[in-house]
Amino acid sequence: MKESFCYGSFLLGEQMIENGLYVVKRDILNIITSLGGDCDINSGDKRPVFCCVKDKKVEGLYWAIPTSDISHRDESQVDYYNMCLACDERDLRSCYYHIVKGNRTALYKISSCYPITEKYIDHEYKVNNIHVIVQRNEDLLEINRKFRRIIAMENRKPNYFRQHITDVKNYLIKELETEAIKDTN
């Protein structure tokens, strides 16, 4: 059995739950910027990310989508999000964002997604001491549809998006491979 280590309040070896919200460690943001990518380095480790998809090919790799409270956005930003959302479905910009209405309106920044491993999760995002997990099927289907389009573009044009998804993914894959070798020794 794999030994568990505490990273924040998230145990290494503990599995992330698909569709759960988590708070990331600053380390993943530092990796993104060190590889030439751009991310919300100033507050990205304070906001929840949506870990929507377990990678189908790489064990231990997940995909994180940053979220934001839309009420903190100015009118021009909200106009931009609405313009993207109003684009024809064939236009990739229609996949950049998704808005989820709940207790508060959350913006899912799908085009800012990045790969992540449990090592870079600080803790579960909780409300009233309960881990927040997105359960509304319509939102999950739409987020996943848009996410697949973003990743398809990234696969055609590596590092197309500002966070350098391909470079971050390759870095994390090498890290997972190195850790797997250590575990077998």
Residue ranges and their predicted role:
Residues 28, 71, 120:
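Residue-level detector of flexible, active-site-proximal loop/helix-junction positions
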Residues 17-19, 59, 105:
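Sequence-level motif detector for i,i+2 pairs with an aromatic at +2
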Residues 42-46, 55-99:
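Compact nucleic-acid interaction/catalytic patches
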Residues 13-46:
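Short N-terminal edge-element motif at the start of the domain
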